[in-house]
């Protein structure tokens, strides 16, 4: 029986171990030998059965990436992704590779991101950049999210309320998979805080948790088998969580489960349905961030743009018939040349507007809206034309 060799490159050893813990859920381990092969690297020799067949794997952990000017390893696993089209300085938590018999070359199988943070506000899209940049290389991508997470009282640290993301964020992974024909999904797993007796989780269907689907997907991917069945299951559960979040979204100006279902079936698109709803763009911006002509610009955007999937995300769509009027008012606020204005008007497509908060002055989060533009591309299309305005509480 030929041994197959894999490497798990992780941001740290925890990510490496967590991936193997997922895999071990669904295999019947006959024998396992774990040893250090260097001061930083662990090797697992595993003999197991899966679906009544016997296999031998060697899995080598490589914790710590070559990034931030570190040279921990001889080769940088991210070089392969960059060569394939990854262009953002955003890296996933872990990458699984298969080591070939010839020249010990590594083939990237998939990338994985873990999230145990509170999925609310801009925190929910801050990692969309690494998903977008990785998937566009043709590399499958799993974003594994611990659910549920609570907002805590700042004084007592007691749980206040369950916080959930805008449903457009998990749906963006489904849309991106359909657009790019490369598998990417948000997979939700049960967190340590999950309490089924909590009235806030009444009627929550725990069958949406994806621990076993993740395991089966990874095992079959590593074995070289067809993974369509498990990809479909993960995407279906991804959609079910979109529906759950949309049911529990506050206010009437959000896509509902029936809306997401129409989009998923291809009956309409996120942009077309947003224009059909005609919800005025309504992103609220803090008064302290209203510098320069931002206040006037936001008024112009509200005049011509509709919110995408809801009213209060920081992006909107200006229908093609409104573009000329919008540009005319915009050039009265900002020194935009005629050539630049003509670039916006030269096609017969809608224009997307994206407002990115550039930084927070306290320094607690110097990239509060990172991932916003990739999130918009994943939700709509990377071929859409987007006008981006970066703002912040700057005095000059």
Place the predicted regions along the sequence by residue.
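Active-site metal-binding core of divalent-cation-utilizing nuclease and nuclease-like domains
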Residues: 34-104, 320
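Charged, often low-complexity linker/regulatory segments
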Residues: 1-28
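Active-site-adjacent loop/helix micro-motif of nuclease/hydrolase catalytic cores
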Residues: 118-128
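Non-catalytic C-terminal interaction segments of nucleic acid-processing enzymes
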Residues: 83, 118, 164-396
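Nucleic-acid nuclease catalytic cores
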Residues: 135-167
